[in-house]
Swiss-Prot record:
Compositional bias ranges of the Low complexity kind: 140-159, 199-214, 629-649, 757-771, 836-851
Gene: SLA1
PROSITE patterns assigned to the protein according to its UniProt record, in alphabetical order: SH3 (PS50002)
Name recorded for this polypeptide: Actin cytoskeleton-regulatory complex protein SLA1
GO biological process, one term: regulation of actin filament polymerization
Keyword line: Actin-binding, Cell membrane, Cytoplasm, Cytoskeleton, Endocytosis, Endosome, Isopeptide bond, Membrane, Phosphoprotein, Repeat, SH3 domain, Ubl conjugation
Length: 1244
């Protein structure tokens, strides 16, 4: 659908007042783009004919325009569906009727479709006038009865008086209000102001004028938007014709005196343009004439103009004298040039070129995506037949599908009727430009001024000009477009006028040259009078000028002044004659060359047509030409019956190759192609013995067909050179030289097939393919050898094939084996003077002897201990009691999963270590050992000096061990090193003299060993200490994991934080006090209890509230040491005791642990005596970890203030054990009490 809502005509001229408005002139044709609903201003586009011009768009008052009248009706003779500009062109079908509004451009008509009521353009050569075209009266009636655009238009009954002319409506967007349209200045081309415009005619009166108004049109050769009127409209107006002719070129000559510049030379010359020709006449030299299409380029720069012509080639640089003249010449050249190369003409030419049609002769099946499947009898459009002579791009008429088709399958159809109608349409459009105008006589007389011109036509032209007095006539595109108010005479163009002098020199006249005929020179004087002067009366200079203009010799009219002048003139004329002869010869040579090329092309085309017709006469599908992309494709064409083919071939004297190929076993679809190739190469029957593989391959035969043909020829001529070959001989990969399929036999079996055992397998019983079989050479899988076939009947033959035929076994998924523990991590720690090394356990695969079961198992599965990559080392993290170390009992290490175990006032559980139970060190209560993360398991041995116990720390002002993670400088201590003991101040402090360990200094109290995780000096189970200093109050142990503990007052309590910043925000920090080496007591009303947190900020806001956030938070809200709370996390038992300050007077707390069975008897009793005589302890710790009743092993007694009691038992080794923390299998050693020593109490 187009964008045009209607076609309107300007009734009055309008000058725009704002930039968005459009200037229009009377009778301008307008396309309506948009109607306004709020005011009377409509958006229109003005019709301008020309290739380089842009049609302006703007607002106009709706009262100044009306619907354009219909000139005539036309009917479509062809379908037009492929529009190039859908916004302006209409699609239509044959026999559609249109109302024509404008036909000034004969190639594109502005119409309205009576079918769809759409407005737009249609190609002029696609339509023809409808029978019984509209008469002048009907046109006048249609023009008068056309509805007015707005109610402001004049009524149909009466003519609008000039005094009733309405001003245009006010624009809403106008900045200032206009007083009245009547006050606007009239256009200089108009007769008067808008109110003085005559009323529109009615149907009953002034029929002729209405017809004139309806038919009047304007030529639009100017490419300037301001060229809105044409002075020659009325001059070329023909009231007796229904069709207004559109003259393409202005036949009036324009000439200017210019100066030609050649380097530094300047030559005077004259430039004339008219009748579609450009004449350049130098003052001295040969004049040149070119048609407007020979002008290749034209340009100007101020006063200079540059023209370039071809045929003959000439480049001119002209100086016009002033800028106005240069611009005038450029505009006139632009008019002629634009009219000659109007793109509308090219569009019509492309549209008029109908698509080349063709009829499919044979069926063709597409074998690739770019090919098109066609059937015999289909009609196709041949889109491209030049890119390839063998493959044409075609489009099916019915479905519209396009693709490549073999050219020989298509028969082009030459639509003579369509071609003739197209050509006739173009010829008619050309004839309209020149035959429908009364100016044809003047155009013809001027275009043939160099031939036998008729002065009667010139007089007729003068009469026409006289009759057209008072009408507008266009002189040039840059003239002022002014009308001659007193146009009683037609005056000559002053720029073309020159001074004419008679031969005597007496008379001189300023006139314009019109023409020359019958010995007379016709001149147009400056006063408007036209005269005819005898040629023999004019001077020789004037005659020479006429010769230059017309190109004819006037020697017989010139005066014979002397022999020299005659000789000069004769030489010039001879030179001119030779030049013209030379040009004529060049043109003739070019013409002959073009004709020869056309003849050769025509001859080649005829040869192709003959070849195609010869192939079609055979009534056989032609050969499909090979394509580069498909080397093995076979054209699937409809097969021709063999009988018909043979009968046709038998009619000639040629050998029937088709039957030959059929006898050879070639497929029928390929027989025809091979037959045509053999016929083209003129192969006869007597050439059969000479046919070989290379010849057949050259002729396009396939490899399989080559073998078939050669076998047939060998059989026919009895050639035995490739007779039977032994069975063990090899041919090519799939066949033997005799043509039979290759049957591979094993080297050891060379027996004939008759001697081989016969089986009933289909593969073995299949007979060998004979030479006569048609499908012998089709692609088949390679045949199995006899040996392989026979071997499949038996299970195994002992050959390599048995191994190849075996299927791979599916591996069974083995159960996840228990990882071997790292034995280095399980190396025991000694507390005596002798180190008993652990027996090495092989990490090889498990032996036949099963590993002993774990007697302390707490679950239902017998799961051996696993090593998870690290060994958990014991550490102490809190408790308000000073750590006291016991060196005479069993040390029971404990490992935890995911939870940090703390004991602050209870008894540690006992776990299996080897074959016995070893209680862990007890320092002020049962200490739960803690594991280390990311640190090597380095267990330092307890030290024995003189067989007695070594007090590691005194009980006053002790500093608790610190444990830190990710501290640089990791240096692990070797296990089993003996640390000497030093006594400083109040207690003995062990030191390591075997490795570089920092010494520990104490300045205010006794230091307790520190445990560091990842620190270069680590001590997790012995008496070795890192380098903390105690300079004031007692320091509680700190354990930090990438965190900075803060304390705001008093003694620092142990803190354990993982990526958190513990803060103490309340409660008084009570300093530790040392009272004579006895146990320091703490005030429980505000003393801070150690906090252990993972990734959280633990705060103590008052009172006595220990927290453990290793997956569990324990709180105590008051009182003294509650009962212990037991936690089970991850399969290991974690015991946390968060009791307060340990009482020294007969504690009554008993901690009992049962994790796997019934309640067991207590195994250990730990007694503390921190001052005075030994009191009866009331605290009993009972452990049961496996359901087996354990006997009490020992009683640990500490006396730190009174008499030292003798230990009841030698100190045993500290074994790191636990469920899942890298503990290896149980050792197979046995205890022997007879071999027991101080360092080996069980006698392993």
């Amino acid at each position: 659908m187009t964008v045009f809502l209607g076609i309107y005509r300007a009734v009055y001229a309008y000058e725009p007042q704002t930039p968005e408005e459009l200037a229009i002139q009377e009778d301008d044709l307008l396309y309506l783009l948009q109607k306004s609903d709020i005011d009377d201003w409509w958006t229109v586009k003005k019709r301008v004919i020309g290739s380089d011009s842009e049609e302006p768009v703007g607002l106009v008052p709706s009262t100044y325009i009306e619907e354009a009248p219909v000139l005539k009706k036309v009917r479509a003779i062809y379908d037009y569906e492929q529009v190039q500009n859908a916004d302006e062109e209409l699609t239509f079908h044959e026999n559609d009727v249109f109302d024509v509004f404008d036909d000034k451009d004969a190639d594109w008509l502005l119409v309205k479709s009576t079918v769809s009521n759409e407005f737009g353009f249609i190609p002029g050569n696609y339509v023809e006038p409808e029978n019984g075209s509209t008469s002048k009266q009907e046109q006048a009636a249609a023009a008068a009865e056309a509805p007015a655009a707005t109610p402001a238009a004049a009524p149909a009954s009466a003519a609008v008086l000039p005094t009733n002319f309405l001003p245009p409506p006010q624009h809403n967007d106008r900045a200032r209000m206009m007083q009245s349209k009547e006050d606007q200045a009239p256009d200089e081309d108009e007769e008067g102001p808008p109110p003085a415009m005559p009323a529109r005619p009615t149907a009953t009166t002034e029929t002729t004028d209405a017809t004139a108004a309806a038919v009047r049109s304007r030529t639009r050769l100017s490419y300037s938007d301001n060229d809105n009127d044409d002075e020659e409209d009325d001059y070329y107006y023909n009231s007796n014709s229904n069709n207004v002719g559109n003259h393409e070129y202005n036949t009036e000559y324009h000439s200017w005196n210019v100066t030609e510049i050649e380097g530094r030379k300047k030559k005077k010359a004259k430039l004339s343009i008219g009748n579609n020709k450009i004449n350049f006449i130098p003052q001295k030299g040969t004049p040149h004439e070119w048609s407007i299409d020979k002008l290749v380029s034209y340009d100007n720069e101020k006063k200079h103009m540059f023209l370039e012509f071809v045929d003959p080639y000439r480049s001119l640089e002209l100086h016009t004298g002033n800028t106005t003249t240069c611009e005038e010449i450029m505009n006139i050249i632009g008019e002629y040039k634009g009219a000659s190369r109007d793109p509308g003409l090219r569009e019509v030419e492309m549209a008029s070129k109908s698509k080349k049609r063709g009829i499919v002769q044979y069926d063709f099946m597409a074998e690739s995506q770019d090919e098109l499947t066609i059937k015999s009898g289909d009609k196709v459009y041949i889109l491209d037949d030049k890119k390839s002579k063998d493959w044409w791009m075609c489009q099916l008429v019915d479905s519209g599908k396009s693709g490549l088709v073999p050219a020989q399958f298509i028969e082009p159809v030459r639509d003579k009727k369509h071609t003739e109608s197209t050509a006739s349409g173009i010829i008619k459009s050309i004839k309209k430009n020149f035959t429908k105008s009364p100016s044809r006589s003047r155009s013809r007389s001027r275009s043939k001024s160099n031939a036998n011109a008729s002065w009667k036509d010139d007089e007729l032209q003068n009469d026409v000009v006289g009759s057209a007095a008072g009408k507008r006539s266009r002189k040039s595109s840059l003239s002022s477009h002014k009308k001659n108010s007193s146009a009683t005479k037609d005056f000559p163009n002053p720029k073309k006028s020159r001074l004419w002098v008679d031969r005597s020199g007496t008379f001189k006249v300023d006139a314009e040259f019109i023409g020359c005929a019958k010995g007379k020179i016709h001149l147009h004087k400056a006063n408007g009078v036209k005269i005819a002067v005898a040629a023999d009366k004019l001077s020789n200079e004037d005659l020479a000028y006429v010769e230059k203009i017309t190109g004819f010799s006037l020697e017989k009219f010139k005066a014979n002044d002397g022999s020299s002048s005659r000789g000069t003139d004769s030489r010039d004329s001879e030179r001119e004659r030779r030049r013209r002869l030379k040009e004529q010869e060049e043109k003739e040579r070019d013409r002959r060359l073009k004709e020869r090329e056309l003849y050769e092309l025509k001859k080649a085309r005829e040869l192709l047509d003959e070849e195609r017709s010869r192939l079609q006469e055979k009534e056989l599908p032609p050969i499909k030409p090979p394509r580069p992309t498909s080397t093995t494709s076979v054209p699937n064409t409809t097969s021709v019956p063999p009988a018909e083919s043979s009968n046709n071939n038998n009619s000639s004297n040629k050998y029937d190759w088709f039957e030959f190929f059929l006898n050879c076993g070639v497929d029928v679809s390929n027989c025809q192609r091979y037959t045509i190739n053999f016929d083209r190469e003129q192969l006869t029957e007597d050439m059969m013995p000479d046919i070989n593989n290379s010849m057949l391959r050259t002729l396009g035969l396939r490899e399989g067909d080559i073998v078939r043909v050669m076998k047939h020829l060998d059989k026919k001529f009895g050639r035995e050179n490739i007779a039977s070959i032994p069975t063990n001989a090899t041919g090519n990969m799939f066949s033997q030289p005799d043509g039979s399929l290759n049957v591979a036999t094993s080297p050891e079996t060379s027996l004939p097939q008759q001697l081989l055992p016969q089986t009933t397998s289909p593969a073995q019983t299949a007979p060998s393919t004979s030479a006569e079989t048609d499908d012998a050479w089709t692609v088949k899988p390679a045949s199995k050898s006899e040996s392989n076939l026979l071997s499949k009947k038996s299970e195994f033959t002992g050959s390599m094939q048995d191994l190849l035929d075996l299927q791979p076994l599916e591996p069974k998924k083995a159960a996840a084996s228990t990882p071997e523990p790292n034995l280095k991590d399980l190396e025991p720690v000694k507390t005596g003077g002798t180190t008993v090394p652990a027996a090495p356990v092989s990490s090889a695969p498990v032996s036949s002897a099963p590993a002993p079961l774990d007697p302390f198992k707490t679950g239902g599965n017998n799961i051996l201990p696993l090593s998870t990559g690290f060994v958990m080392m014991p550490m102490i993290t809190g408790g308000a009691m000073l750590p006291m170390q016991r060196t005479g009992g069993f040390v029971v290490p404990q490992t935890t999963f995911g939870m940090q175990s703390q004991v602050t006032g209870g008894i540690l559980p006992v776990q299996k270590t080897g074959n016995g139970l070893i209680p862990i060190s007890n320092t002020g209560g049962a200490m739960m050992p803690q594991t280390t993360f990311g640190a090597a398991a380095t267990v330092l041995p307890l030290q024995k000096t003189g067989g007695g116990l070594i007090p590691i720390a005194t009980t006053g002002g002790a500093q608790f061990p610190q444990t830190s993670f990710n501290v640089q400088g990791q240096q692990q201590l070797p296990t089993g090193s003996i640390l000497p003991v030093q006594k400083t101040a109040n207690g003995l402090i062990s030191a390591n003299t075997g490795v570089s360990m920092p010494t520990v200094q104490r300045t205010g109290g006794t230091m307790i060993p520190q445990t560091s995780f990842g620190v270069s000096q680590q001590l997790t189970g012995g008496a070795m200490m890192t380098q903390p200093q105690n300079t004031g109050s007692a320091m509680m142990p700190q354990t930090s994991f990438n965190a900075v503990p803060q304390i705001t007052g008093g003694a620092m309590m142990p803190q354990t934080s993982f990526n958190a910043l513990p803060q103490v925000t309340g409660g008084a920090m009570m300093p530790l006090q040392r009272t004579g080496g006895a146990l320091n007591t703490f005030n429980t009303g505000g003393a801070m209890i150690p906090q252990t947190s993972f990734s959280s900020q633990a705060q103590n806001t008052g009172g006595f509230r220990p927290q453990s956030q290793f997956g569990l938070t324990l709180q105590k809200t008051g009182g003294i040491a509650p009962l212990n709370q037991n936690q089970f996390t991850g399969g290991a038992m974690n015991t946390l005791s968060t009791g307060g300050v340990l009482q020294q007077q007969q504690p009554q707390t008993m901690n009992t642990f049962n994790t796997g069975g019934v309640m067991q008897q207590p195994q250990m009793m730990t007694t503390f005596n921190t001052g005075g005589a030994m009191q009866q302890p009331q605290m009993m710790n009972t452990f049961n970890t496996g359901g087996i009743m354990q006997q009490p092993q020992m009683m640990n007694t500490f006396n730190t203030g009174g008499a030292m009691q003798q230990p009841q038992q030698q100190a045993l080794q500290n074994q790191p054990t636990g469920f899942g923390f890298g503990n290896g299998p149980q050792q197979s050693r046995q205890a022997n009490i007879f071999n027991a020593t101080a360092s080996n109490p069980f006698g392993f």
